[in-house]
Curated annotation (Swiss-Prot):
Swiss-Prot/TrEMBL catalytic activity: D-arabinose 5-phosphate + phosphoenolpyruvate + H2O = 3-deoxy-alpha-D-manno-2-octulosonate-8-phosphate + phosphate
Family: Belongs to the KdsA family.
Cleavable signal peptide: none
EC number per UniProt: 2.5.1.55
GO molecular function: 3-deoxy-8-phosphooctulonate synthase activity
Gene this protein is translated from: kdsA
Protein name as annotated: 2-dehydro-3-deoxyphosphooctonate aldolase
InterPro entries found in the cross-reference section: Aldolase_TIM, DAHP1/KDSA, KDO8P_synthase
Pfam families, sorted: DAHP_synth_1
BP term (GO), one: keto-3-deoxy-D-manno-octulosonic acid biosynthetic process
């Protein structure tokens, strides 16, 4: 069993019921972000699943230089602070440099380390020194057993508020696969593990100037991951994925979330009997 991590009023790991980290890929604007958060809260309250709201203020690794990146750190954190205050929900976003750590930590309940940056020692240590909960996305290039070294960098700061997230492994060009063995391997570090169900079905750079995705496989992989014992599920959602400014092809439609979460909750209940 992993240690229990507390994020606001949400508890992850330690045998607790499945938690959800969800929200749009990127903050498109204040109105849409608040509307998405309100809808997710309503859905999660109805199903009985705890929510951490996620949204990126800057998508710093978009495929094309012309792709929409978000409102930037200052405006994005303002919007996330408003979501947190209005709904009482914990909030999560990515940090990309040491300079972002301190201002982000003033607002965010969880500092997320992007997959491409998961081995950057200075960033991990700076994040760890805040004492905040740190969610590290496992790089697409990293073996699951290598995450113990990532954990060691953060825990060296006397910070054990660590969550690890599986988001698929590179499989040739423009493709990812999920190795279900990674869940027990990563959980053997003693920290909770979350499955990023939507980035795992991404086709990186698969559309030339943007990434593609296979949304139709999100449910299948999510069900398998919950059956394998993950502590939480990470999903990017959107009212109209076809109109999303980032990662639409692999985002889940908000209308589809209630039925999906009910299935995942039922599987989790069986696993944790």
């Amino acid at each position: 069993m992993t240690r229990e991590i507390t994020v606001g009023g949400v508890k992850i790991g330690g045998g607790r019921p499945l938690a959800l980290v969800a929200g749009p890929c990127v903050i498109e604007n204040e109105t849409a972000t608040l509307r998405c958060a309100e809808r997710l809260m309503s859905i999660c309250n109805g199903v009985g699943i705890s929510l951490i709201f996620k949204a990126s203020y800057d998508k710093a690794n978009r495929t094309s230089v012309t792709a929409f990146r978000g409102p930037g750190m200052k405006e994005g954190l303002r919007i996330l602070a408003k979501v947190k205050e209005a709904l009482g929900v914990p909030v999560l976003s990515d940090i990309h440099s040491i300079e972002q750590v301190e201002p982000a930590a003033e607002v965010l309940d969880v500092l997320q380390i992007p997959a491409f940056l998961c081995r950057q020692t200075d960033l991990l240590v700076a994040a760890g020194n805040t004492g905040k909960v740190i969610n590290v996305k496992k790089g697409q290039f990293l073996a699951p057993w290598d995450m113990k070294n990532v954990v060691g960098k953060i825990s060296s700061c006397d910070n054990d508020n660590i969550i690890l997230t599986e988001r698929g492994a590179s499989f040739g060009y423009n493709n990812l696969v999920v190795d279900m063995r990674s869940f027990p391997i990563m959980r053997s570090t003693g920290y909770p593990v979350i499955f990023d169900a939507t980035h795992s079905v991404q086709l990186p750079g698969g559309e030339g100037t943007s990434s593609g995705g296979q949304r139709e496989y999100v449910e299948f992989l999510s069900r398998a991951a919950v059956a394998a014992g993950v502590d939480g599920i990470f999903m990017e959602v959107h009212e109209e994925p076809e109109q999303a400014l980032c990662d639409g092809p692999n985002s889940v439609r908000l209308d589809d979330m209630p039925a999906l979460l009910k299935k995942l909750k039922a599987i989790d209940a069986i696993v944790n009997q």
